[in-house]
Regions:
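Long, well-ordered core segments of solenoidal/helical folds
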Residues: 4-41, 66-89, 129-156, 197-223, ...
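A structural/positional concept
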Residues: 38-63, 71, 86-125
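Well-ordered alpha-helical scaffold segments within catalytic/enzyme domains
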Residues: 49-67, 113-129, 181-196, 243-260
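Long, contiguous hydrophobic alpha-helical segments, chiefly transmembrane helices and signal peptides
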Residues: 107-116, 138, 142, 151-165, ...
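Active-site/pore-lining binding-face segments in mid-to-C-terminal subdomains
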Residues: 169-235
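Long, low-complexity, intrinsically disordered segments
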Residues: 304-310
């Protein structure tokens, strides 16, 4: 428990502290609305409602404390969603508001992806009924976005799925590499689980889009651009570790389904890892273990090992 308290203090932005009957509340970024003049706004962050780190520690230690946190997490996720089909973000991001005039509620693809995986990977172990359904529902949502217009075409049948789906506004948003990879990985997992070709077809459309524009995504310093806009321009600094974790997961999934994509993914893994090494930004435990799993440990970035991706 002492180690958990120390870890929570060191990673205070990614650990829950204030639990309520409505779910965990955390200090919100000042780029969210509503926000009081003091800047001391508190709310529910969907990525923190699910207790990923507690799940890892429970699997390692089988500690009752972490088990309780996970049960609590499933209850909070159910209460948050209520009778809706998906988990909707309930606060406005001024970043999205300034770019696209999007206000809450909206669907964040990364949030729903991570929640679907939380249910899929651990729900059955905790007695959650139909624990695979969030995976199916979210994969179906991704497949439907081309028909709804929430995509960025590349060529032929290749495209990226937009990051955000507004509930009220009718606008197409950008597609960031981490969201693109996360969505593709969900589709591949859904294909493996349910053997429905529509999931594989959508995943191929995304992977071939990345292959077509690989050179545009990779920056001169080896890093990857954060996102592509509906106008096809590339902007923004990428996350330090998160996208590399996603690339490794993509490699693992395509390895068993269609290995023809592996050279492309290895090139992107090598480029991103080289950038991290040059900047001495280190790596996460997921990156280290993932590279070992796919036999590419030679790309492990230089620097310190970290628990949480930056």
């Amino acid at each position: 428990m002492e180690n958990w308290l120390l870890e929570s203090a060191q990673n205070y932005k990614k650990r829950n502290k204030w639990y309520t009957a409505s779910g965990p509340f955390n200090k919100m970024a000042t780029t969210t609305e509503p926000m009081p003049e003091t800047g001391q706004g508190y709310g529910r962050n969907l990525l923190l409602v699910k207790e990923d780190r507690a799940l890892v520690l429970y699997n390692q230690q089988k500690d009752r404390y972490f088990e309780n946190l996970i049960y609590n997490s499933f209850v909070n996720l159910k209460n948050f969603k209520e009778d809706k089909t998906y988990w909707e973000t309930e606060v406005t991001s001024t970043y999205l508001k300034d770019l696209y005039e999007i206000t809450a509620p909206f669907i964040d693809t990364r949030f729903n992806e991570q929640i679907a995986l939380f249910y899929y990977n651990s729900g059955a172990d905790f007695g959650i009924e139909n624990a695979k359904e969030p995976l199916r529902n979210y994969a179906d949502l991704l497949v439907s976005q081309k028909e709804k217009g929430n995509f960025i075409p590349v060529n032929g049948g290749s495209y990226y799925i937009s990051d955000y789906f507004p509930i009220v506004q009718d606008v197409k948003t950008h597609a960031s590499m981490n969201h693109v990879l996360g969505g593709m990985n969900i589709l591949l997992i859904a294909y493996n689980e349910f053997q429905d070709e529509k999931y594989l077809d959508a995943a191929r459309a995304i992977q071939t889009a990345i292959a077509t524009e690989k050179q545009d995504w990779i920056r001169d310093n080896g890093d990857i651009w954060y996102r592509i806009s509906p106008l096809h321009d590339y902007k923004g600094d990428d996350y330090k570790h998160l996208t590399l974790e996603d690339l490794i997961n993509s490699y693992k999934l395509w390895q068993d389904i269609d290995p023809t994509y592996l050279p492309l993914l290895e090139e992107m893994i090598a480029s991103k890892a080289s950038y991290l090494s040059n900047e001495n930004l280190g790596y996460t435990t997921k990156i280290k273990n993932g590279l070992q799993d796919i036999g590419l440990s030679q790309y492990l970035p230089k620097g310190k090992e970290q628990t949480d991706a930056l």
